[in-house]
Design a protein with these regions (language model features):
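Alpha/beta-hydrolase fold active-site neighborhood
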Residues: 100-253, 296-297, 313, 324-333
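Conserved strand-to-loop "acid loop" that flanks and positions the catalytic carboxylate
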Residues: 254-262
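Conserved alpha/beta-hydrolase "acid-adjacent" motif
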Residues: 148, 264-270
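A catalytic-pocket lid/entrance helix-loop region that shapes and gates access to the active site
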Residues: 41-104, 138-141, 154-179
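Conserved acidic catalytic loop of the alpha/beta-hydrolase fold
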Residues: 11-26
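Glycine-rich nucleophile elbow surrounding the catalytic serine of serine-hydrolase chemistry
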Residues: 13, 31-43
Length: 335
């Protein structure tokens, strides 16, 4: 495990050495998701030669743990439910979307539903078993596909009407087309087991229960996103990251923070946490955008380009015009 043995500090040292070796006097640093964690470590330990830093979907090293993803999901769910409620065509049925989703989680956790679907990428039909935990994970995973948000309420309504196929098709498609592979899962587990699990602030199950008190406890054992990591740590056997690796990043380097309001992985609250110690930073929050903001938002791309041109005064005017998507109408209740 040589990659994990050096941890984030070692990886950042190699990047700093690369800048010098290439003869680059100054460079602009970009990080997204876990890459923002590395970028902040680079700012803290090797600030020389950094002209600007862009942090997209911000993960502050001082707050992230496996248990933190339940409250993050709660923040995302609440915002999407509110956005849906604000659009009459989104959910013209009773009970409301949040209550309906909670009922579905409880029902499916007690009585999972199996169905055969063809993944969106084609191929042979695959069997998908949809339980409460998998339903929650489906919702969290929508953060990676901003274009799909407009259909989320309608898909929940179809499930409530007894048709699991729309959601099951997305679940199957993620599995067959993720492209992560064994190495990707190994890298992710190495990070989580070295940098997050040893610094948990309590049981991930207890944290999940506080975030979603109406969900069955079995949803958090170990279904919810990365709550399996504490169990995996016992067999993965990577060394614990040093405490200083999880320090906040005080820096005066011009920094752009980009956050999506529908990001249940790295929520906007995390971007605000990072901003507290970055006095020369600009925070842009994008309504209705999920994870990887610059990939999903033309406005974010404009802000990013403006920031690279003038890091001290980026033009963020377009952010005010960004709105949540117009949701597809939910089908009426059957029966």
């Amino acid at each position: 495990m040589p990659t994990f043995a050096s941890g984030a500090p070692g990886r950042c040292t190699r990047r700093a050495d690369l800048r010098v070796a290439l003869g680059i006097r100054e460079w602009n640093v970009f990080g997204d998701s876990y890459g923002t964690n590395l970028a902040m470590t680079l700012m803290r330990e090797h600030p020389q030669g950094i002209r600007s830093v862009t942090l997209d979907s911000v993960e502050p090293p001082e707050v992230v743990t496996a248990g933190s993803f339940a409250p993050n999901a709660r923040e995302d769910f609440d915002r999407l439910f509110r956005a849906c409620t604000a659009q009459p065509q989104c959910w013209p049925r009773r009970p409301g979307i949040e209550q309906t989703f909670t009922q579905l989680v409880r029902r499916l956790e007690a009585h999972p539903v199996a169905t055969q679907v063809v993944p969106l990428t084609g191929g042979s039909p695959v069997k998908v078993v949809l339980d409460g935990g998998r339903l929650v994970n489906w919702f969290i995973g929508e953060a990676f596909n901003t274009a799909a948000f407009r259909n989320v309420p309608a898909m929940i309504a179809e499930l409530a009407n007894g048709d699991p196929r729309p959601i099951a098709t997305e679940v199957a498609s993620r599995v067959v087309s993720s492209g992560i592979g064994i190495l990707g899962y190994g890298l992710a587990s190495g990070v989580g087991c070295a940098e997050w699990v040893p610094y948990e602030r309590g049981s991930v199950v207890s944290i999940g229960r506080r975030a979603f008190p109406a969900y069955p406890v079995s949803v958090f054992r170990p279904a919810l996103h990365v709550t399996y990591l504490p169990q995996g740590w016992t067999v993965w056997k990577v060394p614990k990251a040093p405490a200083e690796q999880r320090a906040a990043t005080p820096s005066t380097i011009p920094t752009l923070l980009l956050a999506g309001s529908f990001d249940g992985i790295t929520p906007t609250s995390w971007a605000r946490t990072a901003k507290r110690t970055l006095p020369n930073s600009t925070l842009a929050e994008f309504a209705g955008i999920g994870h990887f903001v610059t990939l999903a938002s033309p406005c974010a791309q404009q802000v990013f380009a403006s920031f690279l041109a003038t890091p001290s005064t980026p033009n963020t005017a377009c952010v005010l015009a960004v709105r949540p998507p117009r949701f597809a109408p939910a089908p009426p209740a059957r029966g």
